Amino acid sequence: MEKNSNIKASPDSLAWEEISTEHIVQDEWIDFRRSAYRFPDGSVFEPFYSYSRRDYVVIVASDTEGNYLCVRQFRQGIQKVTTEFPAGGIERKDGKEYGGSQEVSAEDALAAARRELLEETGYVSDEWSHLLTVPSNATIADNYAHLFAARNCRQVAGQALDETEFLNVVTLPAQEMEVLIAKG
């Protein structure tokens, strides 16, 4: 049998054992770690870098005419202005600042989605549905993205952006959104 070819292994037999962890940066925004792990076959791998950040919400919002509400903003990581759905961090009520939180309550996530939609776009909705919750980057991060749909959004205010947010609201017809998605 080849190494790593047992796809029917039990989850316990696939788990890595943490040998050591050093917190390289730990502040209100991120916990960046360097760790050593023992693999299921007994071999040791190091360094393995990982991080914790806050869970966040992404809102697939559409207005009363069926247009999608998006925001355009500069993203430092890729050095580009992007068009994306409104999104933002979940302010946790359990005292933790970030990380590992499939424990975040559905109410906390929905409250964050409502808050972020209003802050970033000035829009609100009475028609919300939870789409899914997924790991943001399961290879190296322990936070989750909670995706919501907000339908029939209506503008009730201007933007109320955080001091580090500089973004513009754009509305995109469904056909234009499909073209953007096809382009990646």
PLM regions and their residue ranges:
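NUDIX/MutT-family hydrolases
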Residues: 53, 161-184
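Extreme N-terminal tail/first-helix region
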Residues: 1-26
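A short coil-to-beta-strand element that immediately follows conserved catalytic motifs
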Residues: 17, 124-131
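Conserved Nudix-box catalytic region and its N-terminal flanking loop in Nudix hydrolases
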Residues: 2-3, 51-53, 58-63, 67-115, ...
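Active-site-adjacent beta-strand/loop module that shapes the phosphate/pyrophosphate-binding cleft
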Residues: 36-41, 137-156
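Short aromatic/basic micro-patch
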Residues: 84, 147, 171
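Acidic, metal-coordinating catalytic segment for phosphate/diphosphate chemistry
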Residues: 22-58, 64, 73
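Short, solvent-exposed loop/turn elements at beta->coil junctions and helix N-caps
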Residues: 22-23, 132-137
